């Protein structure tokens, strides 16, 4: 069985979720999307290719969290809000409507999280960290001191995540206000990287393991570790919502289109992302189904990708992944 699911020879547009308006606001939650993209595919792709590769340094101003729906298509009391933080990072507020329990995933800084909590008049119960890098834990100390929140992270990072209280490891099951959270050990970007999977809400928080159309750098891990970790994402149900650590889809699309320009599903996704970003809306969450159809790091068996990057058929999956990463870094 291959580590990454085999790329299909033909891709269709059925993988791309749509978007809908709820309560007069644009909702970007997969499964509820029915956005009418009247602009042509060519317009969307050309707009995307004309965008500069830069971070969203003004993210808190352009991506106001009040613009985001927190409506789930799952019969769950768990609601999620995106909180833009420094550069292009996202933190995520988790709110259980039944108990009032609130958590935050990967707060790179405290101020925007405090602002969001104050606006909602919420207290913070938990801080969930996927890994130890400062742009995912930078707000820990201030938030813990202010709210008395418990910090949760990998046991591997017990000496690298400030204020950590609850140590978790692969296959652990932790409860967030009655919601089962399965801990996936997902090294590659870092040795202690974990992902938080909420099966009841079809949601996973992946930090810097996987982005829409890309994956994290190998800061501490190996290609083999990254492949194994990505397989854990691929094995989840197709409708699983992926909340990654960054808003970098537009830049990732440029590379993905360059190595697989004939992928029709990717072309359709480019149009949708271009429309969302032109409206100042996030491209996240994505879904497992979309990433399997479009993400070159999950499509390392694609003949088109291998041909584009001169990767021989004899190359192992780990070697192919390494070459794709090198090509992305040079892009």
From Swiss-Prot:
This is Hydroxyacylglutathione hydrolase 1, mitochondrial. GO terms for molecular function: beta-lactamase activity; hydroxyacylglutathione hydrolase activity; metal ion binding; zinc ion binding. Fe cation binds at residues 135-136, 208. Residues 1-76 form a transit peptide. Binds 1 Fe(2+) or Fe(3+) and 1 Zn(2+) ion per subunit. Electron spin resonance indicates the presence of a mixture of protein molecules that contain either Fe(2+) or Zn(2+). Its cofactor is Fe(2+); Fe(3+); Zn(2+). Mainly expressed in roots, flowers and flower buds. Also detected in leaves. Keywords: Hydrolase, Iron, Metal-binding, Mitochondrion, Transit peptide, Zinc. The gene is GLX2-1. Its EC number is 3.1.2.6. It is found in: Mitochondrion. The keyword Ligase does not apply. It is an enzyme of class 3 (hydrolase). NCBIfam families: GSH_gloB. One of its GO terms (cellular component) is mitochondrion. GO terms for biological process: antibiotic catabolic process; methylglyoxal catabolic process to D-lactate via S-lactoyl-glutathione; response to amino acid; response to anoxia; response to salt stress. It catalyses: an S-(2-hydroxyacyl)glutathione + H2O = a 2-hydroxy carboxylate + glutathione + H(+). InterPro entries: Beta-lactamase_class-B_CS (IPR001018), Clx_II_MBL (IPR035680), Glyoxalase_II_hydrolase (IPR050110), HAGH_C (IPR032282), Hydroxyacylglutathione_Hdrlase (IPR017782), Metallo-B-lactamas (IPR001279), RibonucZ/Hydroxyglut_hydro (IPR036866). Thiolesterase that catalyzes the hydrolysis of S-D-lactoyl-glutathione to form glutathione and D-lactic acid. Pathway: Secondary metabolite metabolism; methylglyoxal degradation; (R)-lactate from methylglyoxal: step 2/2. It holds the Pfam family Lactamase_B. The keyword Zinc applies. Belongs to the metallo-beta-lactamase superfamily. Glyoxalase II family.
């Amino acid at each position: 069985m291959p580590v990454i699911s085999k790329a299909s020879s033909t891709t269709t547009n059925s993988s791309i979720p749509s978007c809908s308006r709820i309560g007069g606001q644009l909702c970007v939650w997969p499964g509820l999307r029915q956005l009418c993209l009247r602009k042509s595919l060519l317009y969307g792709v050309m707009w995307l290719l004309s965008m500069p590769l830069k971070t969203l340094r003004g993210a808190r101003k352009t991506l106001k969290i009040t613009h985001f729906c927190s409506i789930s298509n799952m019969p769950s009391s768990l609601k999620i809000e995106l909180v833009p933080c420094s550069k292009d990072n996202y933190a995520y507020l988790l709110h259980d409507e039944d108990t009032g329990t609130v958590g935050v995933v990967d707060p790179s800084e405290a101020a925007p999280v405090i602002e969001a909590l104050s606006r909602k008049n919420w207290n913070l119960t938990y801080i969930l960290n996927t890994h130890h890098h400062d742009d995912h834990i930078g707000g820990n100390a201030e938030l813990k001191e202010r709210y008395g929140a418990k910090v949760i992270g990998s046991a591997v990072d017990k000496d690298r995540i400030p204020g950590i209280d609850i140590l978790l490891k692969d296959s652990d099951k932790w409860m967030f206000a009655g919601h089962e959270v399965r801990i996936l050990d997902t090294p590659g970007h870092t040795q202690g990287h974990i992902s938080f999977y909420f099966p009841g809400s079809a949601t996973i928080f992946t930090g810097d393991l996987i982005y829409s159309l890309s994956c994290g750098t190998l800061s501490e891990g190996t290609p083999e570790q990254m492949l194994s970790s990505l397989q854990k994402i691929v094995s989840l149900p197709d409708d699983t919502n992926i909340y990654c650590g960054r808003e970098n889809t537009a830049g990732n699309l440029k590379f993905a289109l360059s190595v697989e320009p004939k992928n029709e599903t990717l072309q359709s996704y480019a149009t949708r992302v271009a429309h969302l970003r032109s409206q100042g809306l996030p491209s996240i969450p994505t879904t497992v189904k979309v990433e399997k159809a479009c993400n070159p790091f999950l499509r390392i068996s694609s003949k088109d990708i291998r041909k584009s990057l001169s990767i021989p058929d004899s190359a192992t999956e780990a070697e192919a992944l390494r070459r794709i990463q090198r090509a992305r870094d040079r892009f």
